[in-house]
């Protein structure tokens, strides 16, 4: 079974943990408890293939940013999360993306831009068009989600698996060649 290393990044309080826990455990975490680093594993089926996702839920707070380079180096796909209710969280994404591209040393990195908390429409300050435009600029997928209302949560991770598969298809294991041996 192929394994996928997915890293969830974004500012503090945008709902990275809520999205991850909703996907992995199907529960919504109501209280905010800043994450240092949590790792989750979940087996899913995407396009008929069994996949093991290893999801790294990272710290959004500044004091843990030194660990980011390591996450980015090992990650195969990235979820960049902002809150539609906080402009500053949207503004932080440019630097995060640049850091990913620098660490990976390529522009072709599987990535999904996620505007979370779409259930809080009345508190929206970041328009959907802004998210779409940034995703176009980043050349990546875009989704608005709600961990609370379970909107598009699974789609984020399935989309990333498909992007990773497209970028680096799994190589079929070749059977070792058998050679004939003659003993005299």
UniProtKB/Swiss-Prot annotation:
Residue positions assigned to the propeptide: 182-184
Positions contributing to GTP binding: 10-17, 57-61, 116-119
Motif Effector region: where in chain: 32-40
Cysteine methyl ester: modified positions: 181
Reported regulation of activity: Alternates between an inactive form bound to GDP and an active form bound to GTP. Activated by a guanine nucleotide-exchange factor (GEF) and inactivated by a GTPase-activating protein (GAP).
Disruption phenotype: Flies exhibit disruption of the early stages of photoreceptor cell determination, adult eyes lack the R7 cell.
CDD domains: Rap1
Keywords assigned by UniProt, alphabetized: Cell membrane, GTP-binding, Hydrolase, Lipoprotein, Membrane, Methylation, Nucleotide-binding, Prenylation, Sensory transduction, Vision
Name of the featured protein: Ras-related protein Rap1
Organism encoding this protein: Drosophila melanogaster (Fruit fly)
Gene name of the encoded protein: Rap1
